[in-house]
């Protein structure tokens, strides 16, 4: 069975306020083992990045200026994820942003029925603990998904 572990970075916290996706990372797992297949995309958001968001992910408007816009990576992204199960930490956030981008491109939305959200699992396993996925990383560069 194929599962895809997915994460995004954004220009801010609210897709409803026009914030955009600036990075997508996807790692493939088959039968619960990581394979050598992954997808990593930087995206030009065509808008400024909130200072608070930039403090978290370190990506700047200058760095993203020559990257493709979301419409230009949509097919590559959807071809990679197909209809497979997505594993996402705080899934409503990422799916909300992905569906806002899909809507701008006239593409049907992703269904939460194909998503496992690890945030409720983390809260169940570690009640009262900080549930931020980024705190699980000890590597200085979480962008190395190879």
Q: What positions do the PLM features span?
A:
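A structural motif
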Residues: 126-136
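Conserved DEDDh/DEDDy metal-dependent 3′-5′ exonuclease domain
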Residues: 56-128
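Short, glycine/polar-rich helix-capping loops at beta-to-alpha or helix-loop-helix junctions
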Residues: 48-51, 132-133
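Entry/capping segment at the start of metal-dependent catalytic domains
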Residues: 1-32
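Single conserved hydrophobic/aromatic residue that forms the stacking wall/gate
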Residues: 137-146
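Conserved beta-strand scaffold positions in the cores of enzyme catalytic domains, especially
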Residues: 3-5, 38-40, 115
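Short glycine-rich, Thr/Ser-proximal phosphate-binding strand/loop in the N-terminal lobe
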Residues: 27-46
């Amino acid at each position: 069975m194929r599962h895809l572990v997915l994460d995004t970075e954004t220009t801010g916290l609210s897709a409803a306020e026009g914030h955009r996706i600036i990075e997508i990372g996807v790692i493939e797992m088959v039968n619960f083992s990581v394979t050598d297949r992954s997808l990593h995309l930087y995206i030009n958001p065509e808008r400024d990045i909130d200072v608070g968001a930039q403090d978290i992910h370190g990506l700047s408007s200058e760095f993203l200026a020559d990257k493709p816009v979301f419409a230009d990576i949509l097919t590559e992204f959807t071809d990679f994820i197909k209809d497979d199960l997505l594993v996402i930490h705080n899934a409503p956030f990422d799916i909300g942003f992905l569906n806002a981008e899909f809507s701008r491109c006239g593409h049907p939305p992703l269904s939460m029925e194909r998503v496992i959200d690890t945030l409720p699992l983390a809260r169940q396993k570690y009640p009262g603990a900080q549930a931020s996925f980024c705190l699980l990383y000890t590597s200085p560069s979480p962008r190395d998904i190879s």
